[in-house]
Amino acid sequence: MSKIEKLIKVLCPNGIIFKTIGEICETITDYVAAGSFKDLSNNVKYLKEPDYAMLIRTTDIKSNFKGDKFIYINEAAFNYLWRVNLDKESIVLPNIGNCGEVYYLTPNDLPYKRCALATNSILVRSKQVNMKYLKHIFLAKDFQTQLKKIISHSGQTKFNKTDLKKLKIPVPPLEVQEEIVRILDKFGELEAELEAELEARKSQYEFWRDKLFEQNVKEKYIFEDILKSLKTGLNPRKFFKVNTVDAVNYYVTVKELGERNVRYWESKDKINSEGLQRINERSNLEVNDVLFSGTGTIGKVSLIEKEPKNWNVKEGVYILKPKKEKVIPTYLMYLMRSNYMKKLYSDYIVGSPVSSIPMKELKKIKISLPSLQEQERIVNILDKFDKLVNDISEGLPAEIEARRKQYEYYRNKLLSFEELVVNG
């Protein structure tokens, strides 16, 4: 018998009390609780430069505060937003977009001395239950099933505080909560160690990749001279519509360009056969084409390794068709990912707020290109690194995924309780 089973047998043999979120959480609030939209606009000004406090978005938390495009606020705004000051142990639930995600934060996790929660999220705190237990409960299958029932799918997914307060969760004695947290946190620690190792391997991979591309190669080419063509996809406009009744093919955007392959099945938008044909008249997608995001998030790269039968791309995703007598397709993919290439095309990026690199400018870039034999040697080296850091079927990503599934299994098992039935 496990320690948890023994504790339950002694402390609550007849079952676990279930309570609503509203009953156990003293704080269930958000950014807009401070006042009307007009008052918020008057009292809170977003600043690009560091100031008194930082406004924390879920995108910042998700990226582990990497990057430099943070939002800051002055002292008056921070005090105005006192309800969502992140000065204590907190749980953050996105409630507009990304519903179902759960973030546990302490002040030590944050990159700035004073922080407040931004829009589109709910801040939850409880003095009655262990906050880490609450985090695990919110991630568990039973709670997520309840949450799905209160999520609206008109436009962006969303739910409100009022409905959240009504959801029920098991509240075992604190000793049981603490033992559950101890067990589940071990999985989290192991996953964090693996992710840290993966980050180190990625840095190593990027270092050697860039070193290989920055070799002093005498042979120089104008970029368009190593390509058969440089094309792009097509936007709906008057040509076709997305998500029609007969739409069964995937309409791929920059978001679906993966580390190597195109994750076309993740696209939210679909097109019918006529739309697919119209796009392909322009894009002419084929195996060994390299896809490059030339607008918006510039620099995402994928290689087409299987015939693209049921998907095509939007305008802004560039299709690079390599001349195989000049460049190996896989080498071209790695080249487009490299910092060497990014430095070459960054001077030609235009536009704000949506940036892009014009195809005519990309064609003009002068690059160093080794022999096909040397390209093959470089590809073999980088393929090994790529498998280690990006392949979800083997290497570190596969190990991380296995640990995550193990955590989810034990979390759902440990957090499934028999409810105490109170008669009368």
Which residues does each predicted region cover?
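Short amphipathic alpha-helical linker/capping segments at the junctions of internal repeats
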Residues: 112-115, 198-214, 244, 309-313, ...
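Accessory (non-catalytic) regions of SAM-dependent nucleic-acid methyltransferases
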Residues: 1-11, 413, 423-424
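A short beta-sheet element
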Residues: 57-58, 75-139, 253, 274-276, ...
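Sequence-specific dsDNA recognition surfaces
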Residues: 26-45, 59-88, 226-241, 255-287
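Short, structured motif recognition centered on aromatic/hydrophobic residues
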Residues: 16, 21, 25, 53, ...
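Amphipathic alpha-helical segments
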Residues: 1-2, 13-19, 134, 165-206, ...
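A short glycine-rich beta-alpha junction/loop motif
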Residues: 113-121, 152-172, 310-318, 350-371
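Non-catalytic DNA-recognition/assembly elements of restriction-modification systems
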Residues: 10-39, 211-235, 399, 405, ...
